[in-house]
A protein has these predicted regions:
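Gly/Ser/Thr-rich loop/hinge elements
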Residues: 1-29, 67-76, 88-89, 99
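Soluble non-cytosolic domains of exported or imported proteins
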Residues: 24, 36-43, 115-123
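Loop/turn elements at helix/coil->beta-strand transitions in domains of secreted/extracellular proteins
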Residues: 27-29, 53-56
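Terminal peptide-recognition signature
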Residues: 30, 49, 96, 128
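Active-site-proximal beta-strand/loop segments in catalytic clefts of secreted hydrolases
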Residues: 33-37, 59-62, 86-91
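Extracytoplasmic/secreted cell-surface and envelope-processing proteins
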Residues: 39-45, 66-69
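C-terminal regions of proteins
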Residues: 66-112
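Low-complexity, Gly/Ser/Thr/Pro-rich intrinsically disordered linker/tail segments
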Residues: 100, 104-136
Length: 136
């Protein structure tokens, strides 16, 4: 569909494909640490990892949803000349679910406490290392 000053592009999510088999792909355990600071491109990567089961996510849910809006477009309001911005893209979950606006949930949920941070202890990293070394 054409707009007055641009174009609208839509992608049919049914045409998106899952990553195929690749004999070069690493077959060992892969842990990806996530949390409330996981956002933007890192959140999109986390989304694909979760939906395609490419690795095990460890930590706490991301603060940004898998379905989110971005790609900021700046413009000036014609009558007031006020500068404004709006999002011009919706980024969708890799699984095609456009209704889920919650954060990406980890496979293994672990949270650092304020005391952990104060004592320079990383409970999330420790749990990831345990999972890799012991398989649980």
């Amino acid at each position: 569909a054409d707009w007055e000053n641009g174009k609208l592009y839509e992608y049919d999510v049914r045409k998106l494909s899952k990553p195929g088999k690749n004999k070069l792909r690493y077959k060992g355990k892969v842990a990806v640490l996530i949390g409330t600071g996981t956002f933007s491109s890192a959140n999109m990567l986390t989304n694909a990892i979760k939906d395609y089961k490419l690795a095990t996510l460890i930590g706490e849910p991301t603060a940004e949803p898998g379905n989110d809006f971005g790609e900021i477009f700046p413009f000036m309001l014609p009558n007031t000349y006020i500068n404004a911005t709006t999002a011009i893209k919706m980024f969708m979950r890799a699984n095609g679910d456009t209704g889920d606006f919650s954060g990406i949930k980890p496979d293994i949920e672990v949270r650092n406490t304020p005391e952990d941070i104060q004592n320079k202890k990383d409970r999330v990293l420790d749990r990831a290392l345990q999972w890799i070394q012991e398989g649980r």
